[in-house]
């Protein structure tokens, strides 16, 4: 993979101001192999920023671009490359854990990748209850299932809002490994979390939000 700083930006935000306005615009460039860690107090706009980058909200001013093109010019095309995980896990309660992951593989164009599916169930500690409805999963199990879906999505860009919520120490370690592998393969991620910058291996930028879109990039590199 080419040096991240030399590569063109995959995701770029220019002059971004949230719907509340009144704050300094945000500029962001995310390149292959980079992770941006978004931090801020509750109500600072972390979720609004992630939803704006995902195309679910329109900014008051500014634009979000994927590979140089405004995401709102072709949202379906953008969604072919982007996986978004919000506070809701986005899994079907009516389907089993295995069926949820099988659907993720189908959407990713790899419907026959059963070994990959079974490995994900084992790695995330979901194998024992894989054939029970997802509605029966605990909060932590539901979050692990959602992360396994993101991992199997094969999307180049991950937008993760508090992905560590409800995770135990072993699952948190697995999340770190998942992010490391994604970045090493040329992927990119924006992650909102209350954890300190050094907690995320591979983190190349930390975005400190006061109020959206008052943001400041601090530190060129926060590798753990």
UniProtKB/Swiss-Prot annotation:
Leading EC class: translocase
Binding site for ATP: 40-47
Keyword field: ATP-binding, Cell inner membrane, Cell membrane, Cytochrome c-type biogenesis, Membrane, Nucleotide-binding, Translocase, Transport
InterPro entries, per the entry: AAA+_ATPase (IPR003593), ABC_transporter-like_ATP-bd (IPR003439), ABC_transptr_haem_export_CcmA (IPR005895), P-loop_NTPase (IPR027417)
PROSITE patterns linked: ABC_TRANSPORTER_2, CCMA
EC number: 7.6.2.5
Chief location category: membrane
Membrane topology category: Peripheral membrane protein
Entry GO CC: plasma membrane
Catalyzed reaction equations: heme b(in) + ATP + H2O = heme b(out) + ADP + phosphate + H(+)
A biological process term (GO) from this entry: cytochrome complex assembly
Keyword Phosphoprotein: no
Location in or out of the cell: Cell inner membrane
The UniProt record lists the keyword 4Fe-4S: no
Subunit structure: The complex is composed of two ATP-binding proteins (CcmA) and two transmembrane proteins (CcmB).
Family: Belongs to the ABC transporter superfamily. CcmA exporter (TC 3.A.1.107) family.
Job of this protein: Part of the ABC transporter complex CcmAB involved in the biogenesis of c-type cytochromes; once thought to export heme, this seems not to be the case, but its exact role is uncertain. Responsible for energy coupling to the transport system.
Annotated protein name in UniProt: Cytochrome c biogenesis ATP-binding export protein CcmA
Organism: Bordetella bronchiseptica (strain ATCC BAA-588 / NCTC 13252 / RB50) (Alcaligenes bronchisepticus)
Gene name per UniProt: ccmA
């Amino acid at each position: 993979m080419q040096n991240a700083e030399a590569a063109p930006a995959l995701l770029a935000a220019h002059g971004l101001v949230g719907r509340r306005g009144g704050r300094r615009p945000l500029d962001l460039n995310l390149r292959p192999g980079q992770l941006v860690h978004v931090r801020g107090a509750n109500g600072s706009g972390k979720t609004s920023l992630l939803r704006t980058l995902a195309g679910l909200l329109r900014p008051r001013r500014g634009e979000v671009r994927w590979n140089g093109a405004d995401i709102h010019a072709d949202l379906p095309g953008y969604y072919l490359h982007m996986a978004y995980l919000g506070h809701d896990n986005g899994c079907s309660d009516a389907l089993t854990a295995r069926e949820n992951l099988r659907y993720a593989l189908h959407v990713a164009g790899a419907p026959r990748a059963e070994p990959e599916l079974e490995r994900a169930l084992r790695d995330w500690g979901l194998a024992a209850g894989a054939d029970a409805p997802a509605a029966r999963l605990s909060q932590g199990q539901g979050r692990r299932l959602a992360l396994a879906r993101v991992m199997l999505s094969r999307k180049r860009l991950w937008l993760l809002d508090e992905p560590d919520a409800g995770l135990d120490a072993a699952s948190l370690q697995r999340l770190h490994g998942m992010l490391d592998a994604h970045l090493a393969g040329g992927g990119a991620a924006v992650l909102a979390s209350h954890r300190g910058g050094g907690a995320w291996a591979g983190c190349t930028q930390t975005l400190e939000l006061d109020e959206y879109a008052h943001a400041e990039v601090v530190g060129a590199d926060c590798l753990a």
